[in-house]
UniProtKB/Swiss-Prot annotation:
A motif (DXD motif) lies at residues 110-112. One of its GO terms (cellular component) is Golgi trans cisterna. Predominantly expressed in shoot and root apical meristems. Expressed in epidermal cells of leaves, inflorescence stems and seed coat. Expressed in pollen. The keyword Isomerase applies. Disruption phenotype: No visible phenotype under normal growth condition, but significant reduction in total cell wall arabinose. Rgp1 and rgp2 double mutant is male gametophyte lethal, with an arrest in pollen mitosis. RNAi-mediated knockdown of both RGP1 and RGP2 causes severe developmental defects and strong reduction in total cell wall arabinose. It is an enzyme of class 5 (isomerase). Transmembrane segments: none annotated. The modification N-acetylvaline is found at residue 2. This is UDP-arabinopyranose mutase 1. It catalyses: UDP-beta-L-arabinofuranose = UDP-beta-L-arabinopyranose. It comes from the Eukaryota. It comes from Arabidopsis thaliana (Mouse-ear cress).
Length: 357
């Protein structure tokens, strides 16, 4: 049995890394009591809370946190007609927080994620580990069998090309979860009591050309490097699919990172995922996606961007055209999704105009 860490008595970190360069984005429909546990690690940072569902409901935030809160009315007011690209009644709404942030880095976490313990019993400062991951280079072009070569006590193994040892900039840090695993509905139904108790003390770069299922509940990224591609798609209310929002974004960012020569890491840090979602509700949301992903994944595996695409926005616009061309025959939903991808980029550029040289 794995338990969350007890953070009572841990002092608030008064020398936090990247304090003025990082926002924490939290999507929620409920009071944020869980932040009390995270106070020692997250209180120094600015929070962007994206309230999903009923905008008239009041969300309580523990005292002492610096935050701004956006509900659906705010999203509609700020984006106008372009608000149609932001999902409703789905945690995909979190990507609105990425858009309104003005910081270089983003850490996003779900409200059912608690502080984990490492094998020694020490509370894991997930944000600190994400920052370390993002500030260290990645090695997507050649796999190092000792995993992260830049970590203390590790290095490049014999046979690793010296020409590749500088690595590349890291765009994304994908963390993992103890307790409730991030399973799809069929697996949840077959293994309802399964809990993840394995703490693997490793960080690795996902190799170029390899896709992965990105989970949005413990994720950090360099907004300046990859932000415009972190669109969690059209999911939830009024859409034929849900629970594919973070994975859609992950497939898009991986194709773009591979094209632009950026790195994506996975592994540490762990959080404690406290609550299993209802597998029957999940199955209804995922049902079409379970079949569609057998076409979606080969699409992303074969997606090729042109050499003219040199910015994230240009890459994303090319990808949206490919989605319309290749995936729309599967279902009209993909035509709508491709249009929403374009709207997302237009809205991003409106709120984040390019700086003039």
């Amino acid at each position: 049995m794995v338990e969350p860490a007890n953070t009572v008595g841990i002092p608030v970190n008064h020398i936090p890394l990247l304090k003025d360069e990082l926002d924490i984005v939290i999507p929620t429909i409920r009071n944020l009591d869980f932040l009390e546990m995270w106070r020692p690690f997250l209180q120094p940072y600015h929070l962007i809370i994206v309230q999903d569902g009923d905008p008239s409901k009041t969300i309580a935030v523990p005292e002492g946190f610096d935050y701004e809160l956006y509900n659906r009315n705010d999203i509609n007011r700020i984006l106008g007609p372009k608000a149609s690209c932001i999902s409703f009644k789905d945690s995909a709404c979190r990507c609105f927080g990425y858009m309104v942030s003005k910081k270089k880095y983003i850490f996003t976490i779900d409200d059912d994620c608690f502080v984990a313990k490492d094998p020694s019993g020490k509370a894991v400062n997930a944000l600190e580990q994400h920052i370390k991951n993002l500030l260290c280079p990645s090695t997507p072009f050649f796999f190092n069998t000792l995993y992260d070569p830049y970590r203390e006590g590790a290095d490049f193994v014999r046979g690793y090309p010296f020409s590749l040892r500088e690595g590349v900039s890291t765009a994304v840090s994908h963390g993992l979860w103890l307790n409730i695993p991030d399973y799809d509905a069929p697996t949840q139904l077959v293994k309802p009591k399964e809990r993840n108790t394995r703490y693997v003390d490793a960080v690795m770069t996902i190799p170029k050309g390899t896709l992965f299922p990105m989970c949005g509940m413990n994720l950090a990224f360099d907004r300046e490097l990859i932000g415009p591609a972190m669109y969690f798609g059209l999911m939830g209310d009024g859409q034929p699919i849900g629970r594919y929002d973070d994975m859609w974004a992950g497939w898009c960012i991986k194709v773009i990172c591979d094209h632009l020569g950026l790195g994506v890491k996975t592994g540490l840090p762990y959080i404690y995922h406290s609550k299993a979602s209802n597998p029957f509700v999940n199955l209804k949301k995922e049902y079409k996606g379970i079949f569609w992903q057998e076409d979606i994944i080969p699409f992303f595996q074969s997606a090729k961007l042109t050499k003219e695409a040199v910015t994230v926005q240009q890459c994303y616009m090319e990808l949206s055209k490919l989605v319309k061309e290749k995936l729309s025959p599967i279902d009209p939903y993909f035509d709508k999704l491709a249009d929403a991808m374009v709207t997302w980029i237009e809205a991003w550029d409106e709120l984040n105009p390019p700086t003039k040289a």
